[in-house]
């Protein structure tokens, strides 16, 4: 898999230096979240956010998101770190920001962007696989899931300005949005238009 990650070679005063593409982007304060969110991904993104704050607490961070979502607790670790650190975090939806990734997109503390063909999805959290065990344990798990559902709706309402009840209603089923619809909803601030190219 690592052979699929491009390497960038730069000339320095000490000679050539090679970086994997993600490390090179990080040097420019760019974090790329381009996979589903699990604990390992959350740890890497959180570490990058903390490193960039340590490097320069007054300089903005740009996070590009192309993700189908993932584990809620892992996503909330990234979200809480974004809210905690001093640098503003600008978020960009490219391709898709679905489920937990849409929460991260909306939770940008700087400007929140969507590229023109990005698709954004909000919905309620869902559980993979079956839930088993004693009835009391299943009841405890169900209460925790309902608490998580409520918390995610509150986060989306906070960042979009939408009434909590509307967010809950809209999240009952998959709610896909175009970049423009996401802007109207309050998930993003700006739909990025293509750069003008000079004609030869």
From Swiss-Prot:
Its main location: cytoplasm. It is found in: Cytoplasm. GO terms for molecular function: ATP-dependent peptidase activity; ATPase binding; serine-type endopeptidase activity. It is an enzyme of class 3 (hydrolase). It catalyses: Hydrolysis of proteins to small peptides in the presence of ATP and magnesium. alpha-casein is the usual test substrate. In the absence of ATP, only oligopeptides shorter than five residues are hydrolyzed (such as succinyl-Leu-Tyr-|-NHMec, and Leu-Tyr-Leu-|-Tyr-Trp, in which cleavage of the -Tyr-|-Leu- and -Tyr-|-Trp bonds also occurs). GO terms for biological process: protein quality control for misfolded or incompletely synthesized proteins. Cleaves peptides in various proteins in a process that requires ATP hydrolysis. Has a chymotrypsin-like activity. Plays a major role in the degradation of misfolded proteins. It comes from the Bacteria. Belongs to the peptidase S14 family. This is ATP-dependent Clp protease proteolytic subunit 2. CDD domains: S14_ClpP_2. Fourteen ClpP subunits assemble into 2 heptameric rings which stack back to back to give a disk-like structure with a central cavity, resembling the structure of eukaryotic proteasomes. NCBIfam families: PRK00277.1, PRK12553.1.
């Amino acid at each position: 898999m690592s052979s699929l990650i491009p390497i960038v070679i730069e000339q320095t005063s000490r000679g050539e230096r090679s970086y994997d593409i993600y490390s090179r982007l990080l040097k420019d304060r760019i974090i790329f979240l381009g996979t589903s969110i699990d604990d390992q991904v959350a740890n890497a993104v959180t570490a990058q956010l903390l490193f960039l704050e340590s490097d320069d607490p007054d300089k903005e961070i740009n996070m590009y998101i192309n993700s189908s979502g993932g584990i809620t607790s892992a996503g909330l670790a990234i979200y809480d770190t974004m809210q905690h650190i001093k640098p503003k975090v600008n978020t960009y939806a490219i391709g898709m920001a679905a489920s937990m990734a849409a929460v991260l997109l909306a939770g940008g503390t700087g400007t929140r962007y969507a590229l023109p063909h990005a698709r954004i999805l909000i919905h309620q959290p869902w559980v993979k696989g079956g839930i088993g065990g004693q009835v009391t344990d299943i009841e405890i798990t169900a209460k925790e899931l309902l608490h998580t559902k409520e918390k995610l709706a509150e986060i989306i309402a906070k960042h979009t300005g939408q009434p909590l009840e509307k967010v809950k209603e809209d999240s009952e089923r998959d709610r896909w949005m175009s970049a423009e619809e996401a802007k109207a909803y309050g998930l993003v601030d700006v739909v990025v238009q293509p750069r003008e190219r000079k004609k030869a």
